[in-house]
Amino acid sequence: MKLKQKILTLVLSLCVVAACLPVVASAETAPQGLWTDYAASAFDGGSGTKADPYQIATAEQLALLAADVNSGAGSKTHTKEYFKLMDNIDLSAHVWTPLGYETYASGGGDAKAFQGYFDGNGKKITGLYVDERTGNSWGKNRSAGLFGVIASIGSEEPIIQNLTVENGTVFAGDGNATSGDWYGAGVLIGRINPMHGTAYAVIKNCTVSGTVSSTKNAAGLVGDSNYIHFENCTADVKVNGYSTAGGFVGNTFASEFTGCVAKGDVTSYGWCTGGFAGVLYWDTTVKHCAAFGNVEAGDWRIGGFAGFAQTNVTIANSIAAGDVKSNLSNWDPKAGGFLGEALYDKGNNNGQESEFVKLEKCHAAGKVTTAKTDGSIGGLLGSDESKNISVVGCSFDNVKNASLAGVGSNPTGTYGITAQNTAAVASGICENYY
């Protein structure tokens, strides 16, 4: 009993600490020049094989990798080649050009993606400053981060691992919330897609911190993720977006997240905003993940963990510890302490409903407040439009949310949601997450 009380006290303390995390301010003055103009002529060593990876020991050598990949020229694409960081790197002297890029133009665009393996070797990159807003002379990249665009090559080997990026600053988009051009941004990766078909790739043991601002798909670690497994990664990032914004990932398709954490606050002026993910879509699984930041949005579909989940999405043993605030006053906010909205997609399989959303042993510890007091507002789930949802062993704090039911609107069946006091919710978190 004493051990359980000690663990319960620790969980409550962690929630308080997470809510009080300092906000990392972005750089007031941008560095001068682009790192690709200062690229080295060679790496520090290695031949690019798994046994003998190219060695990167300086900022100039890292810039060489970016310049090579972005050139798209022959062997410089480094497809299926290996890289290893040999020392900590400071990028504060110049603006970083994302490693791998894509551009958009009327009638077509261009893309040069990173298609290799990068081992951070336990080292740290500091001083990252990326500004791909279209108002800049160089701002033509749709996806921004240390890596702009990655095309995964379908190997079970981690394509990025053992890397820390500390206090990075990333901008994407044109700074105009009404723009029709969409961008993706994360401190580590702007966008990642499979190179061939639906082959999965792995990203593991990566930690990032800083600030991210993007017109769309703004997130702490990765803006847009497709067919990727993330393992034991953490994002402590203040995120500002217009739509599809999340503390860890903005938009995701057919991906898996295990043991991942989002610590930063998320603010969005648009729709689909969550403490961990803006959108979880199509065959996506989340296990033992947490969102500790507060979430605030100006449009619908907002949740402490995810704004929106649709089509074969499972979230298990995961928590949302931050508060949720919707500023939408003239429309249904679809706001939930854990998930904003669960939605059914299309059709069935041989007469059986084949699309589902599952929440298993998930908990919401924050307070939900909305500018519009009626509508789809729930302690755990804002709106259920899924037609085929399973909720088992979940809870929300009914002390902080005394007027709310577990589901705000359109209940489709029996929900395993318990309204509990603060200590009981923390106990559930202790049992199911830690």
Outline where the language-model segments fall:
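Bacterial N-terminal signal peptides that target proteins for export
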Residues: M1-V11
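Surface-exposed repetitive/solenoidal architectures
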Residues: E28-Y434
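C-terminal segment of classical bacterial N-terminal signal peptides
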Residues: V17-S26
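Residues within alpha-helical transmembrane segments of multi-pass membrane proteins, especially transporters
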Residues: V11, C15-V17
